[in-house]
Amino acid sequence: MHQENYTEKAIRTIGVPSAVSRMFGFNSPQSVFNWIKNNKVPAERVIQLCELGGWVVSPHQLRPDLYPNQTDGLPKQ
């Protein structure tokens, strides 16, 4: 069974990896490409990535190990 790459979906929602890399202040897009390859965003980047993507992908989808409930990490309404 194929697991959806939510990391790639979150990044593509924002734009291309190089643009996302610049938004995070990285000198190179390599870190962002590694996130996609491993389908894992560093814990300290999850909320910002979701926010930049307009919450199309949730923290729970990106890191269910850190955000076990579907609404964890989402902004309060």
Predicted regions and their residues:
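A short, basic/aromatic helix-end/turn motif that makes direct DNA contacts
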Residues: M23-N27, G54
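Recognition helix of helix-turn-helix/homeodomain-like DNA-binding domains
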Residues: F26-K40
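Short, charged recognition helix plus adjacent turn
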Residues: E4, E8-K9, I14, S18, ...
